[in-house]
Amino acid sequence: MLRAAARFGPRLGRRLLSAAATQAVPAPNQQPEVFCNQIFINNEWHDAVSRKTFPTVNPSTGEVICQVAEGDKEDVDKAVKAARAAFQLGSPWRRMDASHRGRLLNRLADLIERDRTYLAALETLDNGKPYVISYLVDLDMVLKCLRYYAGWADKYHGKTIPIDGDFFSYTRHEPVGVCGQIIPWNFPLLMQAWKLGPALATGNVVVMKVAEQTPLTALYVANLIKEAGFPPGVVNIVPGFGPTAGAAIASHEDVDKVAFTGSTEIGRVIQVAAGSSNLKRVTLELGGKSPNIIMSDADMDWAVEQAHFALFFNQGQCCCAGSRTFVQEDIYDEFVERSVARAKSRVVGNPFDSKTEQGPQVDETQFKKILGYINTGKQEGAKLLCGGGIAADRGYFIQPTVFGDVQDGMTIAKEEIFGPVMQILKFKTIEEVVGRANNSTYGLAAAVFTKDLDKANYLSQALQAGTVWVNCYDVFGAQSPFGGYKMSGSGRELGEYGLQAYTEVKTVTVKVPQKNS
């Protein structure tokens, strides 16, 4: 995912992870100490009201890292109460200059950069992604996101409006209020930054639920939020499970907005809960089955490497992964042969090893789910060209897997696998591939590889997706919005568009004695 990763292009694989490319990456502590494993409310650490805990597991070994406080409805209630108090008129947060909010976000980014090596190691320990990627990609994008929104803090404002009559009219961009934020496990630090940046820049307060699979880095950042100087109650972080803590946020009558990144199935549940409670506004960034279209005139070397990257990056655990690779028939055989060779050469192993390209899946549940999809693919007639099995005797490692001769009606071509399983489909004409690509309930992203500008423009307009990449994949920047069509979600994150979901527009009209132009 992400711009920093894509910038390396074909070097992102073996070449990015070579010794030469990693000279600037400090050596990790493979057993980083865990400092924060409780609930963060009002700038203080708390045990769960129930005193319950849950284990967070190292996916490379299957061993428990530590126990974490298990937040539930009562803990969410406490967090919402603290956030609401911090948002009261006259509070330090409400009276703070917008420019000072920006300085606090910049200070938070500085503290994250100070602790970058530790956070990258902790992310790798808890999530399983290669340490080099945690350090060079995820942390890099976290810093850029927070600093980008720090710059917006005093620049997203209303306007004066010349209405008829002796009146003066203007708009204010006001914070929504208490924002519930539920983040996923595939990019824990980055998704935290995507949510916190626009919310805090616009003056909101936050109650965040972190994924139970990967709570540790987000909780450590809570310590840095306090150190940066954010007032108590502005950010509250509750580790816990979706059906309990997550559901409590989505249905809470005193939460004004909820933002969720995760599966379409859970997104539906959250939208229903929001509507049946207080009609809180909702933004959803959900699943995808993104088409990656390789035209016959594409640069073959680049297309093969980018298609590999589009699917296998982050162990295939990307909502926008290029998981339907459509290849024009006259280059299909060569593309498949070269894609299989590239997958076979992919280095799977210890995520702290600088040579590793692919670590484990995040947990046993995902591990078994992906293996189940592989079996389904074989049973339904897709041709297994490489991989398909377990890649280590412990941990949740899966071999890089490629299926050929995939048909649109097969389960693996319709459902989000969220793992290192590439599906390659053949097409004849550009008109055909547009129809097939759009024949999906999802619409998060798409890509096209071609040297023909007319084809690129036609496809970028015809494809039903929130993001279309041309001759690249997973190029992200904090400046560009991201979000989906159809069942891939609603609303946008990042960029100026990402601020809209966190503000209310108020119109103020004043009677004046006499208007002069």
From Swiss-Prot:
**What Gene3D superfamilies would the database entry show?**
Aldehyde Dehydrogenase, Chain A, domain 1, Aldehyde Dehydrogenase, Chain A, domain 2
Q: In which pathway does it act?
A: Alcohol metabolism; ethanol degradation; acetate from ethanol: step 2/2
Protein EC = 1.2.1.3
A biological process term (GO) from this entry: regulation of serotonin biosynthetic process
Q: Where is this motif: SIFI-degron?
A: 9-24
PTM annotation: In response to mitochondrial stress, the precursor protein is ubiquitinated by the SIFI complex in the cytoplasm before mitochondrial import, leading to its degradation. Within the SIFI complex, UBR4 initiates ubiquitin chain that are further elongated or branched by KCMF1.
What Gene Ontology terms describe what this protein does at the molecular function level? Answer: aldehyde dehydrogenase (NAD+) activity; aldehyde dehydrogenase [NAD(P)+] activity; carboxylesterase activity; electron transfer activity; NAD binding; phenylacetaldehyde dehydrogenase (NAD+) activity
Could you list this entry's UniProt keywords, alphabetically sorted.
Acetylation, Disease variant, Dwarfism, Intellectual disability, Mitochondrion, NAD, Oxidoreductase, Transit peptide, Ubl conjugation
**CDD domains documented for this protein:** ALDH_F1AB_F2_RALDH1
Subunit text: Homotetramer.
The record's function comment reads: Required for clearance of cellular formaldehyde, a cytotoxic and carcinogenic metabolite that induces DNA damage.
The entry assigns this protein to a family as follows:
Belongs to the aldehyde dehydrogenase family.
Q: What is this protein called?
A: Aldehyde dehydrogenase, mitochondrial
Gene expressing this chain:
ALDH2
